[in-house]
């Protein structure tokens, strides 16, 4: 369930807008999406894990806020990110 350093590095490289970019909304949303997918799988196996479910809800909320920010500031970057990640917004 933890994010391996190598996986994190690959996600950052793939979604970075320039070299050394780790804080752009695209990178943050991509990392959150990976964590959300892993936590969703965990919760399918462990449906009574209420504490992890709360963490999942917080991550989804944070991702939604970042996506709303990106949609406001740069709609074209928002659309490409949604398509690349396969999110249904």
Swiss-Prot record:
Keyword RNA-binding tagged: yes
Name this polypeptide is given: Small ribosomal subunit protein uS15
Keywords: Ribonucleoprotein, Ribosomal protein, RNA-binding, rRNA-binding
InterPro entries linked to this entry: Ribosomal_uS15 (IPR000589), Ribosomal_uS15_bac-type (IPR005290), uS15_NS1_RNA-bd_sf (IPR009068)
Protein family per UniProt: Belongs to the universal ribosomal protein uS15 family.
Subunit description: Part of the 30S ribosomal subunit. Forms a bridge to the 50S subunit in the 70S ribosome, contacting the 23S rRNA.
PANTHER family assigned: RIBOSOMAL PROTEIN S15, BACTERIAL AND ORGANELLAR (PTHR23321), SMALL RIBOSOMAL SUBUNIT PROTEIN US15M (PTHR23321:SF26)
Gene from which the chain derives: rpsO
NCBIfam families on file: S15_bact
Function according to Swiss-Prot or TrEMBL: One of the primary rRNA binding proteins, it binds directly to 16S rRNA where it helps nucleate assembly of the platform of the 30S subunit by binding and bridging several RNA helices of the 16S rRNA. Forms an intersubunit bridge (bridge B4) with the 23S rRNA of the 50S subunit in the ribosome.
Gene3D superfamilies in alphabetical order: 6.10.250.3130, S15/NS1, RNA-binding
Any single GO BP term: translation
Short name of one Pfam family: Ribosomal_S15
């Amino acid at each position: 369930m933890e994010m391996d350093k190598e996986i994190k590095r690959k996600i950052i490289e793939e979604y970075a807008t320039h070299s050394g970019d780790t804080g752009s909304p695209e990178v943050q949303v991509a990392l959150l999406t990976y964590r959300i997918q892993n936590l969703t799988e965990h919760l399918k196996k462990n449906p009574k894990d209420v504490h992890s479910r709360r963490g999942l809800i917080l991550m989804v909320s944070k991702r939604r806020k970042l996506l709303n920010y990106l949609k406001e500031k740069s709609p074209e970057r928002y659309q490409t990110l949604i398509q690349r990640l396969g999110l249904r917004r």
